[in-house]
Amino acid sequence: MNYASVKFKLKSYRILNYLIFYRRSDDQIIQYRLLLLMVGMTVLLQSCGTGSNFERILERPFGSLDDGREVRIFSLRNARGTEVEIMDLGAIIVSLNTVDAHGNISDITLGYDEPQQYLDANAYMGAVVGRYGNRIAEGKFSIDGQDYTLASNNGPNALHGGIVGFDKKMWKTSIHSDNSSATVSLDLISEDGEEGYPGTLSTNVSYTLTDGNRLIIDYSATTDKATVINLTQHAYFNLDGHNAGSILEHEVLINAEQFTPANIES
């Protein structure tokens, strides 16, 4: 496959995709994958080891929300000392600790200390955004001649799934590990008409951390009606460490065949 390479310094750019589901004989399925490669020294930490000497997945409470919902964190670990924490609220990446080129471990994502802070800040910090990442202008769209009006939460526009998007939902979780990777899988059902979107949408997001120091995020969804969807991961990264200051000297290379231009409304 040929790719167009886009290289830029991090400022205000965003790469988006726009997907429409159409039902034929069966439920339509969309899948895509985001892979993050953490490049650094191959350092095996004494505290982790390899094989059966350490637990690849740890689960613990992360406190409760103001409405009483209990939140849990799943820590995925590998043999290189990398650890990523995912919580069932919003399928959020809470932290990503990895070894840099100098052998130092840093948390390279931004996050909060309490789960309620993620809802109060409304910054979509580390969350899976859905049903639709970015704005839909005036909260309106049409499919097959049918007009739909969404819940508006950004002036007249619908932003990141609406008033109660996927980032504010509790996801069902399951875990799996083998001798080279650890996975937490999260599932969510969005009912027909939720936030104004047509179709019942069943979404799965899985995070897999491998001993090759890759964090792989797989997305899949099925719908029973023509709809729009644009799932994304809204983590804020600073490869120097979350408390290291500006990221404006970072450079990003995106291998993409195409991109969707965006403006302040969509």
Residue locations for each model-derived region?
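Bacterial N-terminal signal peptides
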Residues: 36-46
